[in-house]
Amino acid sequence: TEADLTLALSFPVLAGTGIVAALLYRNKVRITITDAVLTVWMLYYAGRVYAGGEYCCATVFLKTVSVYLLYVFLRVVFSHSCISAWWIKAGLVFFGCYEGLLGISQMINGTSRHHLYLLTGTFQNPGPYSACLMMAFVICAFTLSVCSGEGIRWRKPPFFPEVFSGIGKFVRLEYVLTVAMLPVVIVLPATWSRAAFVSIAVVMLLALRRNYWKYRYAVWTSVAVMSASLYFLKQGSADGRLMIWHASLASWWSEVWLGVGTGGFCNAVAEGMAVLHGDGMDLSGAGVTDYAYNILLKILVEQGLVGLGLALMAGGSALLVLRKSSTTLFYALLSLVVFSMFSYPFESLPYRIVAVMIVAWSEARMGIKVSETGRISAVAVLIVMALVSCQLSSVIRLRHEADKDYDMIRGLNDEAFVKDYYELLPLESDNAGFLFDFGKLLRSNARYNDSNAMLRRGALCSADPMFHVLMGNNYRDMGHCNLAEQSYEKAFAIMPNRLYPLYQLMLMYRDNGNVKKARIMAERVLALKPKIESPATKEMKGIAKEIMHDKRGSRKPLIE
């Protein structure tokens, strides 16, 4: 995206800032336990991508490298600066307050960025949007709980120190934080984000643990009531996520130590769904997913126990150090981590930047030293990283341009665009939407084998059963009915609450004159209750009724 490209272009500036700071100040850069574990984890991740190669994962890999480079640059910059935690906390509170005010405006004016949701802030979904409100609330609430009624203690900056000193005498911390909390408190419940509510509850229980024993019965009663309420609030969504987790673990079980491979989570879910369906599990509430809704589960499935162990060591070390550096930021980051156990905040660039910035600041301030490096070594590392970032930005720019070119030709089925799709393929090889559209284009021009080649690649980076349905259509048109039947059955096993795969299989049997199998399939179509009723499902059931009543479904179906 444009934001990823902007971040990559900022790396040389950060590297230059770090180099200047290292040359001007004689401070040595401490290498901490967290630094070491993160570096080992990054090396394992890169090695797993290089040696594995099960899935196309260039986009995910580039984003991960960007996060690691950002951490390295900020670690060096913060090591030579004396930035107070107040600046970070103030920035997060300001961000949350702004998003809260924007949410209020969207509720009043109906200007949400997504037509399905009442409010989304600057995000596309109220889920990630609620995370910034949650962090601002945690910072304000915890600071108010320990505030002693003193005025804000401004650090006198070099510009207008008298002005800032005067403000600190009259503006009280409680007033500022209370005003900042108002839009957050108003908007946060309107997001209906269960992940945010659970995260706030966990942080509150941890912060107030000293009073736990006295109020333990009330606490556990409240936890039980809250858990049941949040589950039944959106039971369908909760059941769907449980199915996603169960299916992904079913696939991971065959690759326990190293995982299925980077970028393979969605395919793991699809394959796991097929396995669970074969075992007779009810998957009527399942849906297509692009996210894991649990960051640790995604790491476990893609990187195995080795990757999860490194992630837990890095995260645990970072949180322990942060707790000593700033208790308020510790609770804020902890709330985001808990939030990521039920949602996907780290799929959004702002939260990756926030997490990296907090950890880099904390490690520079109070990280546990395992070694240290001098100015020359630090400058050398920064120069190497700057060169890597330049190459990274050029690759991201190429992929960003490819995304824009794809947007221009998306949905156009003229044969003249086949060449354009092939030119974009090396840069869009992990884009499921691109591969699906390319497969449709090739199919519309009767290039069935080429179409199936693209659809197979797309199925590796998506959990959508439509890839298998289109492959079945291609096999059917080529006369390979057995392969078509396998593709349709695989599509239904991945998502057994959809009529379309069974409907296509029923039509194939009817067109081939296999009346017996067509009626059997028509019975399955009529007996199945789809997850979402629509005019399309009614049309499919209408064709099935005609076949069942020996009318052979002679009229041409509206849905192909």
Regions found by a protein language model. Give the residues of each.
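Conserved structural position within tetratricopeptide repeats
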Residues: 426, 456-460, 489-493, 527
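Interfacial juxtamembrane loops and adjacent helix segments
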Residues: 113-116, 263-302
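Short coil turns that delineate tetratricopeptide repeat
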Residues: 429-430, 462-463, 496, 530
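Alpha-helical transmembrane segments of multi-pass inner-membrane proteins
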Residues: 10-21, 42-50, 59-76, 83-115, ...
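Flexible juxtamembrane loops connecting transmembrane helices in multi-pass membrane enzymes
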Residues: 118-119, 196, 200-204, 220-253, ...
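Transmembrane signal-anchor hairpin modules in multi-pass inner-membrane enzymes, especially those
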Residues: 1-50, 55-94, 143-176, 208-218, ...
